[in-house]
């Protein structure tokens, strides 16, 4: 029997299993249990949620392996963890710990401003952020098994995630309409690898799932992103920076599943308490915009 562990097909299939669900950032076992009980399909283990990373400034790195192992031991759902863009060793360390997915994340301070990881070299599937089809196709060519919008992490402001989801989906429609002889020029102009564009054109969609991330703070935000075509939702700071994390977690999971049931979403939104404090994007300096990290 052929061993297919870690092949592109297997890794993409693992990511596909999370479709329609919510993945929540957690910093300890207690939060991980709250996420699992609320119905999260996976958790992201890290030292600080994006809002705290943004507030603290400085250099943000991979979480202490003790935190990752604590979370892995507390829940039965898949556990993800973040490494810095281009940091070969952080990725290998996380793989050695046995995490289910690695997020090569712009939320952390990049280790390499030129190269992303060759994700095909790893057995574990990778998640990466994207703002447009060029970024999406490059990450897929490198071996990403799951994509997510970059949005603007830690802001509680959905506007950038909306922009990125609409941009990617509009460009998918454009690629699907191109003639074969036009595809190479489009690849040149966008920096998108030609073979990935051919696959997108053939499928009429990305060949991997694309989740919403970066600014989801309410049940309505989650439902909005699903309506715009997201395959699922990442919630970073929106759960555990809210007034009532357990309530927000359950409500966001329900709203993601029933994203066209407006009466239910209205009911879910009642009595939740305050959502996380938001940040207006225009107030951020260029160097504070995490979405600009990577290429």
Swiss-Prot record:
It catalyses: aldehydo-D-ribose 5-phosphate + D-glyceraldehyde 3-phosphate + L-glutamine = pyridoxal 5'-phosphate + L-glutamate + phosphate + 3 H2O + H(+). Its EC number is 4.3.3.6. D-ribose 5-phosphate binds at residues 25, 154, 215, 236-237. GO terms for molecular function: pyridoxal 5'-phosphate synthase (glutamine hydrolysing) activity. Gene3D superfamilies: Aldolase class I. The active site is at residue 82. Pfam families: SOR_SNZ (PF01680). Transmembrane segments: none annotated. InterPro entries: Aldolase_TIM, PdxS/SNZ, PdxS/SNZ_N, RibuloseP-bd_barrel. Pathway: Cofactor biosynthesis; pyridoxal 5'-phosphate biosynthesis. It is an enzyme of class 4 (lyase). One of its GO terms (biological process) is pyridoxal phosphate biosynthetic process. D-glyceraldehyde 3-phosphate binds at residue 166. NCBIfam families: PRK04180.1, pyridoxal 5'-phosphate synthase lyase subunit PdxS. In the presence of PdxT, forms a dodecamer of heterodimers. Belongs to the PdxS/SNZ family. This is Pyridoxal 5'-phosphate synthase subunit PdxS.
């Amino acid at each position: 029997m052929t061993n297919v562990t870690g092949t592109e097909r297997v890794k993409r299939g693992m990511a596909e299993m999370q479709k329609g669900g919510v993945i929540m950032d957690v910093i300890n076992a207690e939060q991980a249990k709250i996420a699992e009980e609320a119905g999260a399909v996976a958790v992201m283990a890290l030292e600080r949620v994006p809002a705290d990373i943004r507030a603290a400034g400085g250099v943000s790195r991979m979480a202490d392996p003790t935190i990752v192992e604590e979370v892995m031991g507390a829940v039965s759902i898949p556990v993800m963890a973040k490494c810095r863009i281009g940091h070969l060793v952080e990725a290998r360390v996380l793989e050695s710990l046995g995490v289910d997915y690695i997020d090569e994340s712009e939320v952390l301070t990049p280790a390499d401003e030129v190269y992303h990881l060759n994700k095909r070299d790893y057995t574990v599937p990778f998640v990466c952020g994207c703002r447009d089809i060029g970024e999406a196709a490059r990450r897929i060519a490198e071996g990403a098994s799951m994509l997510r919008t970059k949005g603007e992490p830690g802001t509680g402001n959905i506007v950038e995630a909306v922009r990125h989801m609409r941009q990617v989906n509009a460009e998918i429609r454009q690629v699907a309409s191109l003639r074969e002889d036009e595809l190479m020029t489009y690849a040149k102009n966008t920096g998108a690898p030609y073979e990935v564009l051919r696959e997108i054109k053939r499928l009429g969609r990305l060949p991997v799932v694309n989740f919403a991330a970066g600014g989801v703070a309410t049940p309505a935000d989650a439902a909005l992103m699903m309506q715009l075509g997201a395959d699922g939702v990442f919630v970073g700071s929106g759960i555990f920076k809210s007034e009532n994390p357990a309530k927000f977690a359950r409500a966001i999971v329900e709203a993601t599943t029933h994203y066209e049931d407006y009466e239910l979403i209205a009911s879910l939104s009642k009595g939740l308490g305050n959502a996380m404090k938001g940040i207006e994007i225009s107030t951020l300096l260029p160097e504070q915009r995490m979405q600009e990290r990577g290429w």
